[in-house]
Amino acid sequence: MKLMLETGLMFGEEAQLEVTMRELTTGDLLDAEMAAERLVMTPEGEAVLAKSPALFGYELLRRQIASVGKINGPISMRQLRSLTTEDLNRISLYAQSWESAKAEQVVSRGRLDTADQETGKDLSAVS
């Protein structure tokens, strides 16, 4: 899945504008979760791991970027931070709409599976 940025990331003197997105893997999810954890001290002096939901989201997003033009992904957090607000919002909205579309397909398949069980008909060719 591809989208175009307004400002993009610089590669030498050339702005890279075309973003290619990819499916997240289980490894991506685990790596993002670990990257979003920080060791903090409680007032009692105990060390605990704290997870930042916002950081987790950005870690997932940067891993979902397969490339930005000539720049291979996943992009670094530094590169993600260097995006303009508009470009970051564009990527975020695109990723959210892509995930929503995939979720709707799963729900639709579930409806077909349920209809298949109720009618005894093979509806797999419909999807």
UniProtKB/Swiss-Prot annotation:
Biased composition (Basic and acidic residues): 110-121
Coiled coil segments of this chain: none
InterPro entries noted in UniProt: Tail_Gp41-like
Pfam families noted in UniProt: Gp41_Mu
Domain of life the protein comes from: Bacteria
Region (Disordered): 107-127
Family affiliation: To phage Mu protein gp41.
Name of the featured protein: Mu-like prophage FluMu protein gp41
Protein species of origin: Haemophilus influenzae (strain ATCC 51907 / DSM 11121 / KW20 / Rd)
